[in-house]
């Protein structure tokens, strides 16, 4: 009311009040855009958690405040509903992972009960909760938060934490069967296997860290806590195996269970099958080695068939829909299409809610889905559904039908994604807009012939109709109309302008508050203005008189770009496209890149590939550098332990034996090979290294005891097969719940470990003994027996294995020094 009584002075000196010449009313400005939820106008409240807080607790606090607000403050005619809830998404994910973790524990215990004698299974099973709970406590003390990354690490490492315990239990049973007392067998089993276990565990832990040094940006943030979590769990499991398990062995396993004549268990069947297979391999050594090489090469040929994507799609029970109309379209046109599409969505039974942003865009509600710079020709819908599966089903059903349903408009159906860039993006740089536009048009024409692509467009949009006003310098100066005053007057008469603010009183939580309300000046006559009316617009002169615009300026229509994009200071036009659902970028990208390389670009124009290809090109060297550093690190560990270049190189090359199973598994499951799958492969590398060390250490010790290379290799295979089978089985079944859960983020990791582990088990145990035999067939023993006073010191025990303390201490010490 006070604004209506403000006094104004006219050019002739008369005084009037605002309400004499204008109407003043309070209203929401809906001329540029507004929001609706389930067909009703609404306002949006968006909350974002401060860094360093617990998002689940944050969500609980918000729920408490909202419930209190509903009871005490919410008017009866106002409804409040939630569109997105990140705390709920995170809380559900954490709960699911905790469930999968417990299921994995149960599965591993059941597998051990099936494969082990009951007392041995009891001892090994105690390792799982003991190591997990101690590791979780250490993680808490170190400030490592519990989230889906750390929980996924716990599931991945769950089967591996029993590996060392299985090795110690197996050694204990062997020595116990050889006639030792329980205490002697417990001590001897730790002495025998501690250094190989320590070396293998340190190797596995170490290979995860180099990639942290090479990766950067969002990729590094996503995996930052993976290596320390793995390391803590494995090192704790090593301590448990070396300190706790021997005591449990003495207390629980009092004697070796005698075999019942005629009764055979699973490990007996596995051992018999393996003995026959290994004997055949030793009869055909070169065929075995050649066959393994052919198998690895063949799976390498299959590698390009994998679906590759840096980050997978998000598992969300919602999706977004974006509506694009030609530049210059009015809000009413956008509203009409939005209402029609909203009606279509609301008829779907699996849709639980639709929120429409007409002329505007939503706040950020997903980490990699940035708000769109909106206009009157844009609308966005957030569609909530019953489940993740319902979202995918609706996208598959509606996207092909309604993407181009409305003439002149494109409807983009957006599945939530972790990839922050367009899949297909190609840029042209140059100083001349017409030249870069010509290059972009050539590429778009080619891309529109590719059936897998849709919505091929540029970020310059389409040329829009403009009204160009050219001020006559002579006539305007005679009347005292400057360029600035003409611009201001035209802006006031053709649009609106904020000329100030007023403050209104209100209350929050029972306390008085004031809040700012913008004061906007606009001419209602301009709402229906046409092009012919622009000439008749009046401008005030320096003398106070008003003249029509046509008297001091020329008015002409023309087409022009509403925006000119610059990138790194250069004019740039980007051609982007969407891939149809179910398509992947690699083959299409290569075709487009080849076409760009053959394009006759205008003078002064250069091309650049962006989008997913650019992201992959940025991250791939970092990933390869990290893996390379890990391999070098492993090589030096092995070199200092075995003191032979040949055996260290064989171990590095043998890492490839895990690839056939992993690649075939991903192909059969039809899953994406992405950044998270990398940790599945690194885990597989660690499993292979552990088994290599156990096999080659045993073979070295047998040769040191006087066996030939062939006898030592054959005995190493036979003796280490069952422990390797048991450790691989527990690791593989540990990730089964992760596979069954079907998460797009973690299922490929589980498949890589499961399928790769099975393939690795078959190849490592059948090929490496043969390779070892051929490597040392004509050469000297890799570790000559240690002699005291010229007499060979024989080891006491069933395996007749001798340890060289000096060799053990020096090799490991130098290895640890290099690692530090």
Task: Label each PLM-derived region with a short phrase.
Residues 787-789, 808-811:
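Glycine-biased, low-complexity coil/linker segments
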Residues 193, 247, 262-311, 718:
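Signature of alpha-helical transmembrane segments and their immediate interfacial
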Residues 158-172, 193-214, 221-261, 381, ...:
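Transmembrane alpha-helices and their membrane-interface boundaries in multi-pass membrane transporters
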Residues 1, 333-419, 474-495, 511:
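Solvent-exposed, membrane-proximal periplasmic/extracellular interface segments of envelope transport
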Residues 1-103, 169, 444-630, 634, ...:
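Extracytoplasmic/periplasmic membrane-proximal domains and adjacent transmembrane bundles
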Residues 140, 211-222, 293-329, 739-745:
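Transmembrane helices with small-residue packing motifs
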Residues 106-173, 636-720, 725-742, 755, ...:
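Hydrophobic transmembrane alpha-helices and their membrane-interface caps
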Residues 83, 90, 94, 169, ...:
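Helix-loop junctions and hydrophobic alpha-helical segments within the transmembrane domains
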């Amino acid at each position: 009311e006070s604004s209506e009584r403000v006094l104004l002075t006219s050019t002739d000196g008369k005084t009037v009040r605002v309400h004499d010449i204008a109407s003043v009313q309070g209203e929401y400005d809906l001329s540029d855009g507004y929001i609706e939820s389930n067909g009703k106008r609404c306002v949006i409240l968006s909350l974002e958690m401060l860094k360093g807080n617990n998002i689940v607790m944050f969500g609980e606090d918000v729920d408490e405040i909202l419930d209190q607000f509903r009871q005490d403050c919410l008017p009866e005619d106002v409804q409040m509903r939630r569109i997105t809830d990140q705390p709920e998404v995170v809380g559900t994910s954490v709960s699911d992972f905790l469930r999968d973790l417990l299921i994995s524990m149960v599965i591993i215990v059941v597998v051990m009960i099936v494969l082990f004698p009951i007392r041995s299974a009891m001892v090994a099973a105690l390792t799982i909760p003991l190591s997990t709970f101690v590791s979780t406590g250490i993680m808490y003390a170190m400030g490592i938060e519990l989230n889906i990354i750390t929980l996924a690490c716990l599931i991945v490492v769950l089967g591996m934490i029993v590996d060392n315990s299985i090795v110690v239990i197996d050694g204990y049973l062997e020595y116990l069967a050889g006639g030792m007392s329980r205490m002697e067998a417990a001590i001897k089993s730790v002495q025998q296997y501690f250094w190989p276990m320590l070396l293998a565990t340190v190797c596995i832990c170490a290979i995860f860290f180099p990639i942290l040094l090479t990766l950067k940006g969002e990729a590094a943030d996503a995996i930052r806590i993976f290596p320390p979590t793995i390391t803590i769990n494995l090192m704790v499991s090593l301590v448990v195996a070396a300190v706790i398990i021997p005591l449990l062995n003495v207390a629980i396993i009092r004697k070796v269970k005698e075999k019942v004549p005629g009764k055979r268990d699973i490990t007996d069947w596995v051992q018999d099958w393996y003995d026959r297979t290994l004997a055949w391999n030793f009869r055909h050594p070169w065929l075995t080695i050649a066959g393994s090489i052919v198998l690895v090469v063949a799976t390498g040929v299959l590698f390009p068939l994998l679906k590759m994507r840096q980050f997978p799609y998000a598992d969300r029970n919602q999706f977004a829909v974006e509506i694009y109309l030609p530049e210059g379209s009015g809000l009413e046109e956008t509203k009409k299409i939005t209402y029609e599409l909203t009606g279509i969505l609301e008829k779907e039974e699996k849709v639980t809610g639709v929120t429409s942003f007409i002329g505007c865009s939503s706040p950020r509600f997903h980490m990699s889905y940035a708000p769109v710079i909106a206009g009157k020709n844009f609308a966005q819908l957030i569609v909530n559904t019953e489940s993740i599966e319902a979202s995918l089903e609706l996208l598959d059903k509606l996207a092909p039908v309604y993407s181009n349903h409305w003439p002149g408009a494109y409807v983009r159906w957006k599945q939530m994604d972790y990839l922050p860039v367009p899949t297909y993006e190609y840029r042209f740089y140059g100083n001349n807009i017409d030249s870069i536009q010509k290059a972009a048009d050539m590429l778009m024409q080619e891309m529109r012939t590719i059936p897998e692509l849709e919505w091929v467009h540029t970020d310059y949009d389409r040329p829009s109709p403009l009204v160009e006003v050219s001020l006559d310098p002579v006539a305007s100066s005679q009347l005292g109309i400057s360029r600035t005053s003409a611009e201001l007057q035209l802006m006031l008469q053709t649009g609106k302008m904020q000329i100030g603010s007023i403050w209104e009183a209100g209350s929050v939580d029972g306390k008085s508050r004031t809040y700012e309300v913008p004061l906007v000046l606009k001419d209602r006559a301009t709402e229906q203005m046409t092009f012919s009316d622009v000439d008749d617009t009046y401008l005030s002169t320096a003398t106070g008189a008003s003249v029509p615009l046509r008297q001091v300026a020329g008015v002409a229509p023309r087409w022009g770009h509403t925006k000119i994009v610059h990138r790194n200071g250069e004019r740039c036009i980007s051609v982007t496209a969407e891939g149809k659902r179910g398509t992947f970028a690699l083959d299409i990208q290569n075709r487009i890149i080849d076409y760009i390389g053959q394009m006759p670009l205008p003078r002064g124009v250069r091309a650049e590939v962006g989008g997913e290809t650019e992201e992959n090109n940025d991250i791939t060297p970092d990933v390869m550098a990290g893996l390379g550093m890990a391999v070098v690190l492993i090589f030096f560990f092995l070199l200092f332990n075995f003191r032979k270049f040949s055996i260290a190189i064989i171990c590095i090359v043998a890492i490839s034996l895990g690839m056939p199973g992993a690649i075939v598994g991903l192909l059969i499951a039809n899953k994406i090979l992405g950044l998270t799958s990398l940790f599945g492969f690194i885990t597989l590398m660690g499993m292979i290294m552990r088994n290599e060390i156990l096999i080659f250490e045993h073979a070295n010790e047998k040769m040191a005891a006087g066996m030939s290379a062939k006898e030592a290799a054959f005995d190493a295979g036979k003796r280490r097969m069952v422990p390797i089978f048991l450790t691989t089985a527990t690791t593989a079944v540990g990730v089964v719940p992760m596979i069954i859960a079907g998460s797009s983020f973690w299922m490929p990791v589980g498949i890589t470990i499961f399928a790769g582990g099975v393939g690795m088990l078959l190849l490592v145990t059948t090929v490496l003994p043969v390779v070892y035999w051929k490597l040392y067939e004509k050469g000297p023993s890799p570790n000559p027996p240690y002699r005291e006073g010229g007499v060979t010191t024989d080891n006491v025990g069933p395996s007749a294995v001798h340890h060289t303390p000096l060799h053990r201490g020096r090799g490991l010490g130098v290895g640890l020094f290099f690692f530090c």
